[in-house]
Every structure is written in C-alpha cells, then in structure tokens.
UniProtKB/Swiss-Prot annotation:
Its main location: membrane. The keyword Translocase does not apply. It is found in: Cell membrane. Keywords: Cell membrane, Membrane, Transmembrane, Transmembrane helix. One of its GO terms (cellular component) is plasma membrane. This is UPF0391 membrane protein bsl6560. Belongs to the UPF0391 family. The keyword Cell membrane applies.
Amino acid sequence: MLGWVVTFLVIALIAGILGFGGIAGASIEIAKIIFFIAVVLFLVSAVVGLARGRTRI
C-alpha cells in the first residue's frame, strides 16, 4: 500500500510542477487535490506501518 502512495505522490508532484509552471493551467487544482490526498495517505500508511512494528518504507 505504501508503494502506491509513493507512486501517487510522485505523480502529484509532477502534475504540480507542470501545472504551476504554466504548462497546464487547468491542472493546478487537480494537482493540489491529488498532492494532499497522497500526503495524507502516505502519513496514514507510515503511522500504520510503525504501529505494526514494520518500518518498510
């Protein structure tokens, strides 16, 4: 699950760079939403992983 979160985080960062750079102005809001969802999922996965005793990040 953590692998998917990291993948979506990278995709969101790329979309954010393209959107904030002016290449795709309409994707700014989508990139923001995807980025924050990815950050939340990453944090939840990290906390659950640490709570289970696994540190496989």
